A protein has these predicted regions:
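Post-HExxH zinc-binding segment in Zn-dependent metallohydrolases
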Residues: 143-183
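Bacterial N-terminal signal peptides
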Residues: 7-15
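Short pre-active-site segment immediately N-terminal to the catalytic Zn-binding motif
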Residues: 109-125, 140-143
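Auxiliary, metal-adjacent structural segments of Zn-dependent hydrolase domains
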Residues: 23-25, 41-109, 114, 118
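Bacterial Sec-dependent N-terminal signal peptides
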Residues: 16-46, 241, 245-247
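Active-site recognition of the HExxH zinc-binding catalytic motif
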Residues: 123-137
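Positively charged n-region of N-terminal signal peptides that target proteins for export
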Residues: 1-6
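Pan-zinc metallopeptidase signature
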Residues: 187-247
Length: 247
């Protein structure tokens, strides 16, 4: 019996040692396959969007469903309400300093008329779907600068996966090179850092992106939290959950 206990302890110690990745600054985790088994399959637009949606939103959702990353995201979104379509849309007047789209909680996405004329409206909608994934439907969305950056990064990776020469502006045009620099550190297959990228390099670009958003309206408001991840912590857990599935 003592011999068995010793062997078991040795195996556990070796497993823990192998999981550690000091270069990344945080531990990589492969999510269990069991989690995937609970996600809905073969989702249709009508399974997500409550009746009465505009064709523009139905078409944009269809585009997202037919993209690898987008399909993964919408499977997670659907899992929040397996038995009914719960995503609703509400048109609002445009106001200076406010986003043209925003997730208001409880499955409600608000938008201005300007968005309907955007050729990349699926990317903007993907962004809001990601906020649904982050926040769920049981409580109001958190006003977190870190969450906004994570959604921007997810949107960029979705846009990049389409191999299109057109892309929706994220925050503003000056932010794009900062976002691209941060995205260049991320392994699209896992959500963790690419091989050869040091945590210090990643962290520097992460803070620069966070700083940019934090000074930009409306994210510079007193009701917004910075939520900066601690050093050696991964700041984008939902992005890792989305990408690290190998579906």
């Amino acid at each position: 019996m003592k011999t068995c206990k010793f062997i078991l302890l040795f195996v556990l110690l070796v497993s823990c040692w192998n999981c550690a990745e000091p270069e990344l600054g945080f531990e990589e985790k492969v999510l269990p396959d069991a989690e995937l088994n609970f996600l809905p399959e073969n989702i249709r637009v009508m399974d997500l969007l409550a009746p009465g949606y505009l064709d523009a939103w139905g078409d944009a959702t269809f585009t997202i469903l037919n993209n690898s990353i987008g399909n993964k995201l919408l499977r997670y979104v659907k899992a929040l309400s397996p038995n009914r379509a719960f995503i609703r849309f509400e048109a609002i007047p445009g106001e200076d300093g406010l986003p043209d789209m925003a997730y208001a909680g409880s499955g409600l996405i608000r938008y201005t008329g300007k968005v309907l004329n955007n050729d990349c409206k699926d990317e903007l909608l993907f962004h809001e779907f990601f906020h649904v994934f982050q926040n769920g439907i049981e409580r109001p969305p958190r006003k977190s600068v870190n969450n906004e950056l994570e959604a921007c990064l997810a949107q960029y990776l979705y846009s990049d996966s389409k191999s299109s020469s057109y892309f929706a502006v994220v925050i503003d045009r000056d932010f794009r090179p900062i976002l691209v620099a941060l995205a260049s550190c991320i392994d699209k297959r896992t959500g963790y850092l690419k091989e050869g990228i040091s945590y210090d390099e990643f962290h520097e670009k992460y803070v620069a992106a966070l700083d940019f958003i934090a000074k930009t309206p409306p994210y510079n408001g007193s009701d917004w939290m910075r939520d900066q991840a601690g050093y050696n912590e991964h700041p984008f857990p939902k992005l890792v959950q989305l990408l690290n599935q190998h579906l």
